[in-house]
């Protein structure tokens, strides 16, 4: 089996400079989903027909082992787009899947089932089908082509478009989902014989079906497992609706594998994310990129985790952001914490509210619970970092590193000016500005002398 994906459309209703098939759904281009579903349908020999901004599309998928064909006239119609890829199947004796690049909901399972249906008809009825059309029933079929069949069978007579349908035909709820499998020699024959529409000048794939039926090449319908598979993406609102369907499918996939997802309509889980059983995910969470969440962890409301590893039994409290970092076992992050740039938070460490950690290694059992900035630093195990502590790592030209040993104490509102080393068991008194290395076990105090002037405060407050 081979596949041709049609991705040449102008996408004018998107009102965008970007090709429609490159608009993203859960962090992936729309076309990625179609390619992935085709491959999940056990088809690896794939051609993509491009047209509008062809180079952008080809560049985006240059590493996907695809064959590209260019439709010279993007307004030539769907059959003209398939004809642009004729060299891909002109000498091929098998079947070809034709699917739109804006149909990301047609599942790999459905594609496999369509192939199996062709095989069963050949095996049990002795009929080599000319084609199979994916269909579904919609309660409101307005705008879709209606499937006209022989009564009591799945044999298609023709597909009639909404504008051409009689009142009786408009009452039909079975519609064309826009995905087809054709026997390649019959397809090629039909493509060369059909005529352009006298109204638009376009060549339509639905005319291929009518041609095959008239030639005696049997075409049958195959019902999609879910009506949503018929949803194409023609507008930004369609994109939002399709994204919501995929979002819920992904949430359900993980729920069926032992993950608790609260209020799944609000949870964003991208396709490359991996989650182990007994993870609990609260509303408004975003899990992005190649994030991995290990068993027993809890991800609090509104948190965003991208391209990061969260190990076992971690608690990420509300509205925390973690990017390109690792959170080790039993650590606690947040609420309102930010961890980024390849930081590592050690086992049982606590990074609390309004603490930012950037490109730093935080040891086991470290506590930084409030209002701190830790940048370009290594902090040894069991060290305490008080509220308001800042690691000053930038002098206006370059970044410098800091090292704090194990079991040290950094008092509240301390300023550590890098490059600097603070030894094990060192104690820095609150409010200190530290610009020299502190030896192991030493006490460092850096404060201006406090002066008290009796009675002066009241005088100032009462002054007119």
Swiss-Prot record:
Residue ranges, annotated region (Pyrophosphorylase): 1-236
Localization: Cytoplasm
Keyword Repeat among UniProt keywords: yes
Biological pathway: Nucleotide-sugar biosynthesis; UDP-N-acetyl-alpha-D-glucosamine biosynthesis; N-acetyl-alpha-D-glucosamine 1-phosphate from alpha-D-glucosamine 6-phosphate (route II): step 2/2; Nucleotide-sugar biosynthesis; UDP-N-acetyl-alpha-D-glucosamine biosynthesis; UDP-N-acetyl-alpha-D-glucosamine from N-acetyl-alpha-D-glucosamine 1-phosphate: step 1/1; Bacterial outer membrane biogenesis; LPS lipid A biosynthesis
Residue positions of the active site: 370
Primary role: Catalyzes the last two sequential reactions in the de novo biosynthetic pathway for UDP-N-acetylglucosamine (UDP-GlcNAc). The C-terminal domain catalyzes the transfer of acetyl group from acetyl coenzyme A to glucosamine-1-phosphate (GlcN-1-P) to produce N-acetylglucosamine-1-phosphate (GlcNAc-1-P), which is converted into UDP-GlcNAc by the transfer of uridine 5-monophosphate (from uridine 5-triphosphate), a reaction catalyzed by the N-terminal domain.
Assembly and binders: Homotrimer.
Protein name (record): Bifunctional protein GlmU
